[in-house]
UniProtKB/Swiss-Prot annotation:
HAMAP family: ArgC_type1 (MF_00150). Catalyzes the NADPH-dependent reduction of N-acetyl-5-glutamyl phosphate to yield N-acetyl-L-glutamate 5-semialdehyde. This is N-acetyl-gamma-glutamyl-phosphate reductase. Its EC number is 1.2.1.38. SUPFAM superfamilies: Glyceraldehyde-3-phosphate dehydrogenase-like, C-terminal domain, NAD(P)-binding Rossmann-fold domains. Keywords: Amino-acid biosynthesis, Arginine biosynthesis, Cytoplasm, NADP, Oxidoreductase. Coiled coil: none annotated. The active site is at C147. GO terms for molecular function: N-acetyl-gamma-glutamyl-phosphate reductase activity; NAD binding; NADP+ binding. It catalyses: N-acetyl-L-glutamate 5-semialdehyde + phosphate + NADP(+) = N-acetyl-L-glutamyl 5-phosphate + NADPH + H(+). Disulfide bonds: none annotated.
Length: 343
């Protein structure tokens, strides 16, 4: 399969290149960048010197359609809604890593992203690509989930799909490494601001909130809202999500683990930790795994769920490739069979 990557010089695009080079059924046909053309990636990223010699090109839809079966779009939000359309119309596989096609309500997108929304007919065509819970596996247009949304939804799915929790009780405390803020530097991501520090940001206003709610209410329409906070922590990669919920009825630790293990028994990238063991960010670094730890406090009737991912892999490029595997009828783990980097 021939693929093109639009937005190849961003962190998400770079991860796509790294991972796709390990995929036996995929060849990278073209690489595209808004910020640089006619130079190779190694000009900007010397670690790719022996990996990718193809020059960066301007975006030419006609050429991309001729040379590619699949297009990955790894741009910031607000761009894909315009540039994705020719490839969708041409019938190519299109996987968008930005947030432009995730929300089915255009007004919600414009409220939370502060940008004009994609055309209604294209939003309707896009399937939300939470890979473990894809409903239409034959769909060729995927809105790849956000990193916070992926960790949160995988953590909550077994309980919410079975309507086992008090719908008003969901509290999510999510922490991200600095790469989650993207490649463009800012005052808030400057080394002197982030090193030895922890910063709460976008309190009650992170753009992944409506995305999470959209999926949760598909599973349990009685959920009215979630309390969701996000923090930057001084690590490069990783999402560490701690979720607190109250079950409708008391549940034992064994019942809780059995529920999660049965839900994910056929999911190659979700690993449920043993009882009283909680995952760390390092145990999923540079991998497509989501590791989940569970606890139930009988005294407070609170379930704690710890869900960790690598924001650039399971939270972006890795899940995008997982979605490609599903739509192309490859093995779901093709190109993603590697162990995390440790330490």
């Amino acid at each position: 399969m021939k693929v093109s990557i639009i937005g190849a010089t961003g962190y998400g695009g770079l991860e796509l290149i790294r991972l796709l080079h390990q995929h036996a059924s995929v060849d990278i046909a073209t690489l595209h960048s808004f910020s640089a053309q006619s130079e190779t990636l190694a000009t900007f990223y010397p670690h790719l010197k022996d990996l990718e010699a193809s020059p960066l090109e301007k975006i030419n839809p006609t050429e991309i359609i001729e040379k590619s079966d699949t297009v990955f779009i790894a741009t910031p939000s607000g761009i894909a809604k315009d540039i994705a359309l020719p490839y969708v119309d041409a019938g190519l596989n299109v996987i968008d890593l930005s947030g432009d096609f995730r929300l089915k309500d255009r007004q919600l997108y414009e409220k939370w992203y502060g940008k004009s929304a994609a055309p209604t007919e294209y939003i309707a065509k896009a399937e939300y690509g939470l890979a473990e819970f894809r409903e239409k596996k034959e769909t060729t247009f995927i809105a790849n989930p956000g990193c916070y949304a992926t960790a949160t939804l995988l953590g909550l799915a077994p309980l919410t799909k079975n309507k086992l929790i008090d719908p008003t009780s969901i509290i999510v405390d999510a922490k991200s490494g600095i790469s989650g803020a993207g490649k463009v530097p800012s005052a808030s991501t400057h080394f002197t601001e982030t090193n030895e520090n922890m910063t709460l940001y976008k309190m009650n206003s992170h753009q992944h909130i409506p995305e999470i709610m959209q999926q949760l209410t598909k599973w349990d329409e009685s959920i009215p809202a979630i309390q969701f906070s996000t923090s930057l922590i001084p690590i490069t990669r990783g999402i560490f999500t701690t979720i607190y919920v109250k079950p409708k009825n008391p549940i034992t630790q064994k019942e809780l683990h059995t529920l999660y293990e049965s839900t994910y028994e056929n999911a190659p990238f979700v690993r449920i930790q043993p009882e009283n063991v909680y995952p760390t960010v390092k145990q999923v670094t540079a991998s497509n795994y989501c590791d989940i730890g569970l606890a139930y406090n009988e005294k407070t009737n609170v379930i704690t769920i710890v869900s960790v991912i690598d924001n650039l892999v399971k939270g972006a490029a890795g899940q995008a490739i997982q979605n490609l595997n599903i739509m192309a009828n490859f093995a779901e783990s093709d190109g993603l069979r590697f162990i995390p980097v440790y330490p």
